[in-house]
UniProtKB/Swiss-Prot annotation:
Cysteine disulfide partners in this protein: 113-209
Active site, per annotation: 113, 209
Record-level Gene Ontology MF annotations: ATP binding; tRNA binding; tRNA-uridine 2-sulfurtransferase activity
Protein name: tRNA-specific 2-thiouridylase MnmA
NCBIfam families membership: PRK00143.1, trmU
Keyword Nucleotide-binding: yes
Residues engaged in binding ATP: 22-29, 48, 137
Family the UniProt entry places it in: Belongs to the MnmA/TRMU family.
Residues annotated as site: Interaction with tRNA: 138, 354
The keyword Cell inner membrane is annotated on this UniProt entry: no
Gene symbol of the encoding locus: mnmA
Amino acid sequence: MGIIFYTTQMPNFEQNQVIAVGLSGGVDSSVAALVLKEKGYEVIGLFMQNWETDSKDPFCTAEQDLSDAKAIADHIGIPLYVVNFSKAYWNHVFQHCLDEFAQGRTPNPDVWCNREIKFKSLLDHAKKLGATHLATGHYACIQNENNEYRLLKSNDSHKDQSYFLHLLNQYQLANSVFPIGGYQKSEVRAIAKKRGFINHAKKDSTGICFIGERKFKDFLNEFLLAQPGNIETSEGKIIGKHDGIMFYTVGQRKGLHIGGRPDAGEAPWYVVDKDVKRNVLIVVQGYEHPLLYSQELTCTNLHWIRDTEPSFPLTCKAKTRCRQADQTCVVTRLDNDHCHVQFEHPQRAITRGQSVVFYLGNECLGGGIIN
């Protein structure tokens, strides 16, 4: 099976150009490297080490990932360099996440890692090695319109990762390429299997990258001091104790340990809010409880991908989590760094600290942090 090249999603590079690929050991970046290699480009692989781990840590996959990346690089016939960004990751991603958790918010480290590490530190390193562009295995597309770069959704709507890339700027997009943005995930796996890649069936990484498969609560306890407190209903009735509000997020059901109360119905309880000042976790009963829904939000730390921001009020689509269907909304500018977002329909479990990302059709416009 030959590779179908989606040339509309690939810049017209000179074939003697050097393109660096962030090779993670996963199937997506492996096929991205293969696509570039078979199009005739000079390809080099870069494997990032963003977290200092004990090699005996049963939850860390970095050792296996590096082994897989080396095997793929050898298979394709490209050099592989290992680069350590653990200090930069700690300072620009992990510490930010700790600060957010400590303030009762729920951060998204993948968003910050893309802006600060993959498309900054790794891109800079690729340039030092003589590469003109950095390629990754992200499911997204870049389009150049008269030297203004647009971030577009992937052809695979189920795997689209534009949500996680909304903080990228014009320089980062101009110097990046997403070789598999035009593919379906099933096509990527089929190519990898046909070419004999050892990772063709490797499962996708999920969850927070630096936690891996370990329990979230156990990991966070290593870095932040938990303060147990009360769990209250929305009416103010104390019905239990929590282990620390940093361990919970809006919409969460599991881990509350307050079910089966004789003074309540059988419907499950859900986190609806976190009162950081009082160290109180507020819950409601029932998945469809009206307090779990909101038709508006405000956001800060606004970033627009194009150099010229859109006109306001802006009618567009938005997501408040990555796998959510696009939601119609109107965005109104409040000041230089704040916007108000009014949705057409109520949205469930809008969460402080997460990103709200805006779209016009297939284009990702940018976004902000929900507060």
